Amino acid sequence: MKEKKMKYQRYKRGQIVLIDFSPSMGSELRGKHFAIVITKKDSPNNGVLTVIPLSSKEKPYYLDIGNFVSKQVYPQLLNITRELYTALANLDSSDENEYNVEDVQKVINNVNEFKKVANIYINKNKKSFALVQNITTVSKIRIKKPVNHYDPIKNLIADSLILDLVDNKIKELFINDK
């Protein structure tokens, strides 16, 4: 009998993912890091992905790609904040001291869910550096799922300028141009 193959999420080149690189060996990268997907054509049947990890630490051999993460994340977080404030302002009360408990609880739950996401991204207002020399292929199982529906990671993508910088650095580091 034929075994069913596991189906994985499909990722696009340039998409930003959060990967848990632990456990690691020796000097390999460890811990959770954002990474740029560089796989050209991904498939739901493919259980691995080639990525370039990102760091906020500046080192001479890291590629400076600016603060594109915060430039994409902060406007999304600001819009969600506005939506939550609007929801709070729109809580209906027929009496000054009486609110619909279910509506209030729903808004409180949404605020708490949003706080989980905001706490992750709050100190991401820094430059990002691509660790091109650490290009690696990882199991898709290492990719962390979005925290909840407020998590902007599902919408983060490196633009073509950043991908061109990364491609050129890959050529510089790994391709022998004689």
Features from the language model and the residues they span:
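C-terminal terminal-subdomain/extension
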Residues: 1, 9, 62-178
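Eukaryotic intrinsically disordered and solvent-exposed regulatory patches
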Residues: 4, 21-23, 37-38
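Loop/turn positions that initiate beta-strands
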Residues: 13-16
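Short, charged beta-turn/beta-strand-edge "cap" motif at the junction between a beta-strand
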Residues: 22-28, 42
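Active-site-adjacent loop/helix micro-motif of nuclease/hydrolase catalytic cores
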Residues: 27-30, 60-61
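Short beta-strand-centered aromatic/proline hotspots
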Residues: 30-41
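Residues located in well-ordered beta-strands
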Residues: 34-36, 50, 131
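Basic/aromatic-rich interaction segments and small domains that mediate binding to polyanionic partners
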Residues: 39-59
